[in-house]
Amino acid sequence: IDAGRAVTLGLILTELIINAQKYAYDGRPGPLRITLSESDDRFRLVVADDGKGGHKAGKGFGSMMIGSLVTQLDGRIDYRDLAPGLEVALRARIDPASDLA
């Protein structure tokens, strides 16, 4: 992954961690599972918590920023209620130029 996409991915990860801290555990400490995997020409970033669940993408600044950053990656983000907890999965191409080949 190139440096620009890595920075964008880091910003998304940071915002997902902040959101989990704020909403899943109401500002208290709690466990998070973070995985980054690769398959073919795509990567998948997953952030999951064991919090109260039921929370999804909001309409606040952080959620809007995540949406904008995901668009920059030409990716897709999915929210899945684990009851309890939430799993957020981001998928995108590692190298978007591979579409042009």
Segments predicted by a language model, with ranges:
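Short beta-strand element(s) in the Bergerat
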Residues: 41-45, 86
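Glycine-rich nucleotide-binding loop
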Residues: 31, 53, 82-89
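Conserved short strand/loop->alpha-helix "switch" segment adjacent to the catalytic nucleotide/phosphoryl-transfer site
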Residues: 1-17, 21-31
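Acidic ATP/Mg2+-coordinating residue in the GHKL
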Residues: 49
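ATP phosphate-binding glycine-rich loop and adjacent ATP-lid/helix-beta elements
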Residues: 55-81
